[in-house]
Design a protein with these regions (language model features):
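Membrane-interface extramembranous regions
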Residues: 2-155
Length: 155
């Protein structure tokens, strides 16, 4: 006889949008670490900005694996918008802060790649904000069929 056996603990629910967002945040954080080395040589203020941005992106990426929170999504969205705005200004009119205030910087390959990843991160975070799914390593929920079967059996 083929009987269903109740599962004591449900398998983790994998949320691909969380995995994508965590990946994009971590990748942009890594690119900001790479770019930050050159910017520290230009002026310590630029380097500190890149260091703070990369730390926030690494922490945000890690949190996205363990937590689903509207506040976390909003923080990521605001952070990505600020980074993209600063990048856009630095490539159009130039950043007029620091000892070597200069005109616009040229767009390089890593700049464009990082900007694209930031846009992808924004897209996924907005998607998560609109219809939140559990983070990959949050405590898994049992699916309704298993819960119904368990309640029928009196468990």
């Amino acid at each position: 006889m083929n009987r269903l056996t109740p599962v004591a603990q449900a398998a983790p629910v994998i949320s691909r949008p969380h995995l994508w967002a965590a990946s994009f945040a971590t990748e942009t954080g890594l690119l900001h670490v790479i770019a930050g080395q050159d910017h520290f040589q230009e002026w310590w203020g630029y380097g500190v900005f890149f260091l703070i941005v990369s730390l926030c992106q690494f922490i945000g990426g890690a949190l996205l694996l363990f937590k689903s929170s509207r506040g976390l999504y909003w923080a990521g969205i605001v952070g990505a918008v600020v980074v993209l705005a600063v990048w856009s200004v630095s490539r159009t009119i130039g950043v007029h802060i620091g000892p070597d205030s200069a005109g616009p910087e040229p767009i390089g390959f890593l700049d464009a790649l990082c900007g694209g990843l930031e846009c992808a991160l924004l897209f996924v975070l907005v998607r998560l904000l609109r219809g939140s799914a559990p983070a990959p390593f949050e405590q898994a929920r049992m699916d309704p069929a298993r819960e119904a079967y368990g309640s029928i059996r009196g468990q």
